[in-house]
């Protein structure tokens, strides 16, 4: 990467004299990474050489013939059996013809198409965004067997579609359903057969009498001494399991009640000959490094359909590095209006149900509408919420609800009352749908004044005009045979779901040449050149919007390190779009989105947790503009100075120092804290200035207090972190960009894509700010944190901050809840109980749960 971040190692003055930083860790870490790369390259097979014989075994575990699938409509064949000398990314796909305009992903089964036979961006992007797989990675060199492939089952999809009822024992479960070994669970002595059957029924939204299914009875007959099952027994088992989950949560919370705040006890200083500052610092660091934060929790508040509200618990699974959530309670609201007193009453009822919760929760995340009212009322006499052991509860606005309010009204004229803070009414689950289908119901929204309304009018006119319709079908047929069915389906467009709207825009983008050709034959309003351009821009923006929603609603860790930077990058993305349009009419919806997004940014800049997250976003030190935007300066010294105050304020919520003996002697505490550690940003990162004032050269003259002691420790650790990032960031960018065929000219990232014939006729394009964020900066930041978490060289304060950020929730809207709207009837008798069982089963290891005396954290 040709950037000003190169050669930073020589510009940093470290804390080696204070024995805080060991530079050998950086070099060894980098060396190890290169060794791992070499090993990977040795293991990677050269697919171009192997593919010369289509019948040859490409792997000792996978045969190409085993991957051929007949879905009843097409025969899907591994690409290397259709074409020779192809790029490695093709090994991840199946196709039905040599043009490769339509392929099926081996990992998830999704069917992808491309409009131009020379473009492969769609396929490469799918591998990266959906599966986090580099386009340079050979499918056959990956560490799995054919049994792991989503395409192993060759059963015809049409045959499956024709099956009805439960006699077939075909489960249409969502992807989060966790399969488990009934035999193993039975042997654990914690769950009876009736409970196991209840888990299956609740997890799959099956009727209570599902156990009467002939095939299921046959399965149960394989076990000995099966007790008789009735509908009442299953119902009682579901209720009993739900109560057991509640008790499991109560036990887990009660343990936190005894831990918060974390007490750091200092030993008696009278018998020590060490300077008081050094003695206390070492004791505090030793105890900070041993703090167990794995049992901390936060609370999410979400609105469901039918005037129902859901409170859920969120924790961080340190083993699998993901956040997980469990429902606590569902409350029924009297009206759809937002009433903060009603919300507080619900919260108090929640505390009554889970007595330890009030003293153990560290933050609450709310939808945008509720968050605003909480801020307005938190200082009023009527707002009686007490945070318990945590000195100041942190409230966070749900970023997903913020994005929904920013985008939906300007683009689709969605009225505010139609934008539920969370999930819309339950409706049929559509295959290939979007998470956004469960967040907003478009069926009653008037799109006539939007660009989608124009498209619908145009399609309607084509449908009514036999001549135009005939020309359209002929165009689709000549366009490309595999895509014919998909493109012609636009004639029966349905705009009741987000995924349907997105599909219409995607198909229309492929049909622009046809609609341009018939413009002069249209009786109604035709589309102008600016309209066609607007359609392409809206389609691209919606893809980015959907990707953003799915990311922040996911279980990915450390999303708080991305929120502020993400919003600023989206602001830049929208600004570029607005500048590219000449006409006010085209600019208007994007200007509305931008105005709303700027308000969200201002709100997030007031949140200490978001500021801490931004500081801990490694890639922020790759951009002076980001530092200026968030911290108001590019001076690392000033940034660290301000962040030290913020971190101190935040950590004092959770840490209590006891047996501290203050010192009135400034000389005892007056030391060089990290002397000559760090110069300014320009000297460290940009190599433009060496004449800077070092904050760390100053000596402490004030009396030693608890706060001044913590300030020294926090500042030292923040500086150690910056030093570490400055060593690792250039290498991380260099390696990642090389691996993904991306170049950087100092201001723009350019993606270089090989054609399907490999080296010849390669293409390239400049990445927009959001593509940079999702395709470059977030993966690099996550990689740096993965390396940090797995290393032994930890930084105490940074480690604590990361654990706290992992527990806090950026969004109260979680993707695992989206399946509830597809099949869940909230009016049924066992709705809350079923939801609890379903989400427990989908996220936790049931084999590890002791429902009698265990904790929810034991099941991670």
Swiss-Prot record:
Q: Where located?
A: Nucleus
Q: Which SMART domains match?
A: ZnF_BED
Q: Name one Pfam family in it.
A: zf-BED
Instruction: Report TM segments.
Output: none
Query: Which PROSITE patterns does the record match to this protein?
Result: ZF_BED (PS50808)
**In Gene Ontology terms, what is a biological process of this protein?**
vacuole organization
Q: Which UniProt keywords apply?
A: Metal-binding, Nucleus, Zinc, Zinc-finger
Report the protein name in the record.
Answer: Late endosome and vacuole interface protein 11
> What is the species of this protein?
Saccharomyces cerevisiae (strain ATCC 204508 / S288c) (Baker's yeast)
Coding gene?
Answer: ENV11
């Amino acid at each position: 990467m040709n950037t000003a971040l190169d050669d930073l190692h020589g510009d940093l003055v470290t804390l080696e004299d204070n024995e805080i930083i060991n530079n050998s860790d950086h070099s060894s870490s980098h060396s190890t990474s290169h060794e791992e790369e070499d090993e990977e390259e040795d293991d990677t097979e050269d697919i171009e050489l192997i593919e010369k014989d289509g019948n040859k075994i490409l792997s000792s575990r996978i045969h190409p013939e085993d991957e051929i699938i007949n879905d009843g409509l097409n025969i899907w064949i591994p690409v290397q059996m259709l074409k020779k000398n192809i790029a490695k990314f093709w090994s991840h796909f199946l196709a039905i013809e040599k043009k490769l305009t339509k392929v099926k992903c081996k990992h998830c089964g999704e069917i992808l198409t491309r409009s131009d036979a020379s473009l492969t961006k769609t396929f490469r992007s799918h591998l990266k965004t959906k599966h986090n797989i580099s386009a340079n990675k050979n499918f056959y060199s990956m560490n799995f067997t054919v049994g792991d492939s989503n395409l192993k089952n060759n059963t015809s999809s049409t045959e499956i579609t024709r099956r009805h009822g439960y006699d077939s024992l075909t489960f249409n479960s969502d992807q989060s359903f966790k399969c488990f070994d009934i035999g193993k669970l039975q042997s654990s002595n914690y769950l009876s057969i009736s409970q196991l059957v209840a888990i299956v029924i609740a997890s799959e939204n099956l009727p209570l009498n599902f156990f009467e299914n002939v095939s299921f009875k046959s399965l149960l007959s394989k076990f000995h001494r099966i007790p008789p099952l009735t509908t009442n027994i299953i119902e009682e088992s579901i209720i009993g399991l739900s109560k057991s989950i509640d008790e499991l949560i109560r036990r887990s919370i009660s343990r936190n009640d005894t831990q918060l705040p974390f007490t750091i006890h200092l030993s008696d200083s009278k018998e020590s000959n060490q300077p008081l500052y050094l003695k206390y610092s070492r004791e505090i660091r030793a105890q900070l490094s041993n703090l167990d934060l794995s049992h901390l929790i936060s609370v999410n508040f979400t609105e469901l359909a039918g005037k129902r509200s859901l409170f859920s618990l969120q924790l961080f699974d340190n083993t699998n590095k993901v956040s997980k959530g469990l429902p606590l309670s569902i409350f029924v609201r009297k009206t759809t209006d937002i009433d903060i007193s009603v919300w507080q009453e619900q919260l108090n009822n929640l505390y009554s149900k889970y007595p330890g919760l009030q003293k153990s929760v560290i933050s609450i995340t709310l939808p945008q509408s509720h968050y605003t009212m909480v801020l307005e009322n938190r200082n009023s006499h009527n707002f009686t919420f007490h945070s318990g052991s945590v000195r100041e509860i942190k409230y966070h606005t749900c970023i997903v609800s913020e994005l929904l309010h920013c985008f939906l009204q300007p683009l689709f004229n969605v009225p505010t009352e139609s934008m539920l803070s969370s999930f819309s009414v339950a409706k049929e689950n559509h295959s290939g749908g979007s998470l956004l289908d469960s967040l907003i119901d478009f069926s009653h929204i008037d799109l006539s004044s939007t660009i989608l309304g124009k498209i619908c009018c145009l399609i309607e006119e084509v449908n009514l005009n036999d001549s135009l319709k005939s020309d359209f079908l002929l165009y689709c047929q000549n366009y490309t045979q595999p895509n014919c069915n998909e493109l012609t389906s636009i004639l029966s467009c349905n705009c009741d779901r987000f995924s349907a709207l997105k599909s219409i825009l995607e198909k229309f983008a492929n049909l622009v040449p046809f609609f341009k050709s018939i413009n002069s034959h249209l009786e109604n309003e035709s589309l102008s050149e600016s309209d066609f351009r607007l359609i392409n821009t809206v389609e691209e923006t919606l893809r980015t919007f959907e990707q953003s929603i799915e990311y922040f609603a996911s279980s990915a860790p450390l999303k708080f390190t991305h929120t502020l930077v993400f919003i600023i990058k989206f602001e830049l993305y929208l600004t570029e779009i607005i500048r590219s349009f000449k006409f006010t009419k085209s600019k208007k919806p994007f200007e509305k989105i931008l105005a709303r997004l700027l308000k969200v940014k201002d709100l997030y800049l007031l949140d200490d947790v978001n500021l801490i997250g931004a500081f801990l976003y490694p890639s922020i030190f790759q951009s002076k503009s980001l530092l200026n935007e968030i911290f108001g300066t590019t001076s690392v010294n000033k940034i660290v100075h301000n962040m030290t105050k913020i971190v101190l304020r935040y950590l004092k919520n959770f840490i209590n120092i006891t047996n501290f003996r203050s010192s009135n002697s400034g000389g005892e505490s007056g030391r060089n804290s990290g002397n000559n550690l760090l110069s300014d940003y320009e000297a460290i990162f940009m190599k433009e200035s060496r004449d800077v004032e070092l904050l760390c050269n100053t000596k402490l003259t004030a009396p030693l207090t608890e706060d001044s002691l913590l300030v020294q420790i926090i500042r030292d650790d923040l500086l150690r972190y910056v030093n570490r990032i400055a060593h690792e960031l250039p290498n991380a960018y260099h390696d990642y960009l090389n691996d993904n065929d991306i170049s950087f000219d100092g201001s723009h990232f350019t993606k270089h894509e090989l054609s399907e014939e490999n080296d010849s006729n390669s293409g390239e394009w400049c990445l927009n700010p959001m593509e940079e964020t999702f395709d470059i900066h977030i993966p690099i930041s996550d990689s740096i944190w993965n390396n940090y978490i797995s290393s032994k060289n930890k930084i105490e304060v940074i480690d604590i901050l990361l654990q706290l950020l992992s527990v806090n929730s950026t969004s109260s809207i979680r993707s695992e809840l989206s399946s509830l709207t597809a099949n869940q009837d909230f009016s049924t008798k066992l709705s809350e109980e079923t939801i609890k069982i379903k989400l427990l089963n989908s996220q936790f290891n049931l084999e590890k749960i002791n429902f009698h005396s265990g904790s929810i954290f034991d099941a991670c």
